[in-house]
């Protein structure tokens, strides 16, 4: 026995289903990369904001103590008083110092290689010095 399909009977053929799946796949292929780049751009912006916040807090630290924290004391000196430091009035940052937006530690150097201010660096997405695009370093002396 064979059943005939009535004109009023609704249904989706395999071809129609494949066309819909193909359209969805093409849409995802076009939209997802742009969304991923937007997230990476937001991380670069956050890293710059973090570095600017550290620089501001370091300025207040220096006003109180007369010096910047050493490389060994690091950015933690903005949250916890280092041994032997006079006139520390911190904490100079409200939140704990975590990693950069890619979960790599920020690099702090004082004395720095770029003037009288400390060097603060996020090594970007790849966590390695140098790089281009989202792998590029985000640094305090270029903000």
Regions flagged by a language model, labelled:
Residues 9, 34, 38-83:
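Conserved hydrophobic/amphipathic alpha-helical signal-anchor segments
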Residues 2, 44-45, 56-59, 65, ...:
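Short, surface-exposed interaction loops/tails
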Residues 18-34:
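Alpha-helical hydrophobic helix detector
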Residues 1-12:
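N-terminal leader/signal peptides at the extreme start of proteins
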